[in-house]
Amino acid sequence: MAPPTRRLLNAALLLLLLLMATSHQPSGTVVARELRCQCLKTLPRVDFENIQSLTVTPPGPHCTQTEVIATLKDGQEVCLNPQAPRLQKIIQKLLKSDKSS
């Protein structure tokens, strides 16, 4: 193989590897895991029967907002609006049942 062809092939392989490494994130999942807000946008509604668990992260130095991340039964993580009245009622019920246990 001629040197220019080998360089072109190496560049193409490198580009392919970079694309594969960066395109693996499924849509609708929580993206950030660093010291910043994890919820870039929230879903207005979710079928609560599909929720496996909820994680509530209070405001702190990493993010000034309360974040609610729901893990769905299919393993997908989605951000929910912490101001939604139905979600607030569910969180209050969970907190009350946790205190009585």
Curated annotation (Swiss-Prot):
Disulfide bonds join C37-C63, C39-C79. Its main location: secreted. Keywords: Chemotaxis, Cytokine, Disulfide bond, Inflammatory response, Secreted, Signal. GO terms for molecular function: chemokine activity. GO terms for biological process: cellular response to lipopolysaccharide; immune response; inflammatory response; neutrophil chemotaxis; positive regulation of cytosolic calcium ion concentration; response to lipopolysaccharide. It is found in: Secreted. PROSITE patterns: SMALL_CYTOKINES_CXC. Induction: By lipopolysaccharide. Expression increases until 4 hours after treatment and then gradually decreases, remaining high 24 hours after stimulation. InterPro entries: Chemokine_b/g/d, Chemokine_CXC, Chemokine_CXC_CS, Chemokine_IL8-like_dom, CXC_Chemokine_domain, Interleukin_8-like_sf. One of its GO terms (cellular component) is extracellular space. It comes from the Eukaryota. Belongs to the intercrine alpha (chemokine CxC) family. Ligand for CXCR2. Has chemotactic activity for neutrophils. May play a role in inflammation and exert its effects on endothelial cells in an autocrine fashion. PANTHER family: C-X-C MOTIF CHEMOKINE 3, SMALL INDUCIBLE CYTOKINE A. This is C-X-C motif chemokine 3.
